């Protein structure tokens, strides 16, 4: 899978979870035993367990977004950002640190939204899902919401049109050294071929599931920077 495709699929995944929040379709919270079980399964690389942990904690996003209602920001944008914070929380949580998952996730969601608001204040430009961020193959303007709602593989083409290959380096440079190493190896940037997560894990002496978490975190950072840069560029036009 190309780097563009990976980012595209991640965007779509976020949108799926956002739809739960917007429609107030929250599964019941997990019991302590079930939560512990799914955390253990996720550590072993079980993607379904990861998704269940996210879905059963989505009510936290709705609860925390309400705290920011007086900011005047688009609620849909805040839900999207909060959902990204929840995904990061689930993927980085460590039960051994003694903090409850819900407490840790709530903190991550709030921090993600606060960081988003700081960026808006710095650029003095609202970042809305409905603002144009590029053009499709026919020259029509597309917005982030168009990408999120796409039901076809065109979602990958849309992102690739705006995020050209020569721009990759500037997005890579926002990553820390470990994230950069994983992304470069995973997508064969400057190398002969792409590496699997298992191959990278062996080379770095870490677990495959940890490589997966680093990869997702790095892709999310790059996507955030992509959207921020596009909005900043539009503000200057």
From Swiss-Prot:
Give the DNA-binding residue ranges. 197-206
Q: Which residues, by range, are in coiled-coil regions?
A: none
Q: Name one Pfam family in it.
A: Sigma70_r2
- List the InterPro entries: Cro/C1-type_HTH, RNA_pol_sigma-70_dom, RNA_pol_sigma-K, RNA_pol_sigma70, RNA_pol_sigma70_r2, RNA_pol_sigma70_r4, RNA_pol_sigma_r2, RNA_pol_sigma_r3/r4-like
What SUPFAM superfamilies does the record tag this protein with?
Sigma2 domain of RNA polymerase sigma factors, Sigma3 and sigma4 domains of RNA polymerase sigma factors
The short motif Polymerase core binding is annotated over 77-90
Which domain of life does the UniProt lineage start with? Bacteria
Give the matching Gene3D superfamilies: 1.20.120.1810, Winged helix-like DNA-binding domain superfamily/Winged helix DNA-binding domain
**Which UniProt keywords are listed?**
DNA-binding, Sigma factor, Sporulation, Transcription, Transcription regulation
PTM note: Proteolytically cleaved in the N-terminus probably by a SpoIIGA homolog to yield the active peptide.
Single biological process term from Gene Ontology:
sporulation resulting in formation of a cellular spore
Indicate the family of this protein: Belongs to the sigma-70 factor family.
Tell me the function of this protein: Sigma factors are initiation factors that promote the attachment of RNA polymerase to specific initiation sites and are then released. This sigma factor directs the transcription of crystal protein genes, a sporulation-regulated event.
- Tell me the protein's name: RNA polymerase sigma-28 factor
* Native species: Bacillus thuringiensis subsp. kurstaki
Gene that encodes the chain = sigK
């Amino acid at each position: 899978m190309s780097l563009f495709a990976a980012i595209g699929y991640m965007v779509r995944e976020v949108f799926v979870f956002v739809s739960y929040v917007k429609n107030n379709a929250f599964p019941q919270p997990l019991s302590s035993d079930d939560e512990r079980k799914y955390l253990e399964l996720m550590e072993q690389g079980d993607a379904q367990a990861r998704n269940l942990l996210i879905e059963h904690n989505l009510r936290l996003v709705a609860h925390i977004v309400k705290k920011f209602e007086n900011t005047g920001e688009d609620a849909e944008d805040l839900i999207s950002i909060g959902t990204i914070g929840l995904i990061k929380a689930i993927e980085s949580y460590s039960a051994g640190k003694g903090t409850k998952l819900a407490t840790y996730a709530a903190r991550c969601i709030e921090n993600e939204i606060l960081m988003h608001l700081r960026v808006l204040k710095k650029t003095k430009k609202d970042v809305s899902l409905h603002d144009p961020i590029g053009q499709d193959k026919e020259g029509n303007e597309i917005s982030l919401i168009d990408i999120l709602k796409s039901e076809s593989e065109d979602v990958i083409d849309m992102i690739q049109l705006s995020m050209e290959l020569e721009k990759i380096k500037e997005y890579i440079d926002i990553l820390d050294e470990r994230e950069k190493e994983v992304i470069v190896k995973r997508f064969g940037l400057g190398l002969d071929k792409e590496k699997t997560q298992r191959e990278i894990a062996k080379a770095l002496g870490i677990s495959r599931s940890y490589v997966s978490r680093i990869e997702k975190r790095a892709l999310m950072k790059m996507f955030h920077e992509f959207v921020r840069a596009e909005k900043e560029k539009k503000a200057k036009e």
